[in-house]
Amino acid sequence: MIPRRSCWLILLLNLLNVQSLLDASWWSTVAQLSTALAGHNVKPVCELPGLSPGQAQVCELFKDHMPAVSIGAQNAIQECQRQFTGHRWNCSTHYSTGMLGPIHKMATREAAFTYAILSAGVTHEIGRRCKQGLLTSCGCSDETKPKNVPTDWSWGGCGDNVEYGYKFSRDFIDIREKEHDPKRNHDNGRSLMNRRNNEAGRKILKRHRKPKCKCHGVSGACNMKTCWMQLPSMEQVGKILRNKYDKAIRVQINDRGNLQLLADEATKERKTRALPTDLVFMDDSPDYCRFDRHSGTLGTEGRVCKRGSGGAEGCDSLCCGRGYNTYTQEVKSKCNCKFEWCCKVVCQTCNNVTQVDICK
């Protein structure tokens, strides 16, 4: 069994991988991961090369927050994969390392989505852990009672501490973007893009929190209600960000060192301003149809598709015109279950033959 420390260390590496521009120090982090899995001594997590100097300092001050950072990042990646299931880009990780790979070296709309949802995921997990009393430097939310909560309802339950999660996520995640050399034009533009998308993810999470109430009274009479503020689920956040991904705005760095909105390539219309919750990107997306080690795309060969579907998961789209192979597989499942007195359920095993279509 892998020690608990190694488990959350693995998850933390997912977040560091997305943030990193994949310099040599990142690969040394991967090497240390292998050492950790082998059960040998490794550097303390705050000394891992994947952390920027500023992040290492924050890590040292808030070591008990690091499991929340790692779990929040993992939850975000899982939600990313759920939102893009059946698409050519499906937020896949590299099978050999469990990491997202060099695809985030490019300033694409996929990178924009990933940065935003990772930032939201860390904020979400930190806020929840504050509520649960698992972090020493925070507790329940101290938000005031919203105007839309009736006056006769009690406000004072223990709510998710989104304010603390928001601040910690901003301090820990964004600090590496502030450490880039502002004289390097492209790096500065990418850093501004990353920070904006990080902030969009956090703002979406914060804006969609809602009061949650619990009834008190004899036999469910609900004579009294106690309410508190609760964060949206990561699935809700993922759906909102998925819509933002489709409407992401292309930008470039101008002579003043700021992000400038570009005209939409399809409509030729230029937005005069972007909302704080809009996602922005700078580069075209690569061809996700074929495996490319340089760009980090895994390709769609071997992916399961849906024959006859006109959507993204359909074989015509997902297989990129290469066609597909159909295989027959036998699946065993429980069937004809009956309750026997007393007290067990007895089932038969049935064999079901199904067909599955796999992209060439």
Swiss-Prot record:
Location(s) in or outside the cell: Secreted, Extracellular space, Extracellular matrix
GO molecular function: cytokine activity; frizzled binding; receptor ligand activity
Disulfide links within the chain: C80-C91, C130-C138, C140-C158, C213-C227, C215-C222, C289-C320, C305-C315, C319-C359, C335-C350, C337-C347, C342-C343
InterPro entries in the cross-refs: Wnt, Wnt_C, Wnt_CS
GO cellular component, as recorded: extracellular space
Keywords noted in UniProt: Developmental protein, Disulfide bond, Extracellular matrix, Glycoprotein, Lipoprotein, Neurogenesis, Secreted, Signal, Wnt signaling pathway
Main location: secreted
Organ and tissue specificity: Expressed in intestine, pharynx, anterior body wall muscle, vulva, some pharyngeal neurons and SMD head neurons. Expressed along the boundary between the intestine and muscle or hypodermis, but is also expressed in the hypodermis in cells including seam cells.
Pfam families hit by this protein: wnt
Superkingdom: Eukaryota
Keyword hit for Ribosomal protein: no
Glycosylation sites per record: N90, N352
Consequences of knocking out this gene: Anterior displacement of the nerve ring in L1 stage mutant animals. Defective ALM, BDU, CAN and QR neuroblast migration and irregular CP and CAN axon growth and guidance. Double knockout with cfz-2 results in enhanced CAN migration defects, but the same QR neuroblast migration defects as the single cfz-2 knockout alone. Double knockout with cwn-1 results in ALM, CAN and HSN migration defects. Triple knockout with cwn-1 and cfz-2 results in enhanced neuronal cell migratory defects.
Main function: Ligand for members of the frizzled family of seven transmembrane receptors. Probable developmental protein. May be a signaling molecule which affects the development of discrete regions of tissues. Is likely to signal over only few cell diameters. Involved in the correct positioning of the developing nerve ring and in axon guidance of SIA and SIB neurons, probably by binding to tyrosine kinase receptor cam-1. In addition, regulates the positioning of some head neuronal cells, muscle arms associated with the nerve ring and the excretory pore.
Family under the similarity heading: Belongs to the Wnt family.
Protein name: Protein Wnt-2
Organism placement in taxonomy: Eukaryota, Metazoa, Ecdysozoa, Nematoda, Chromadorea
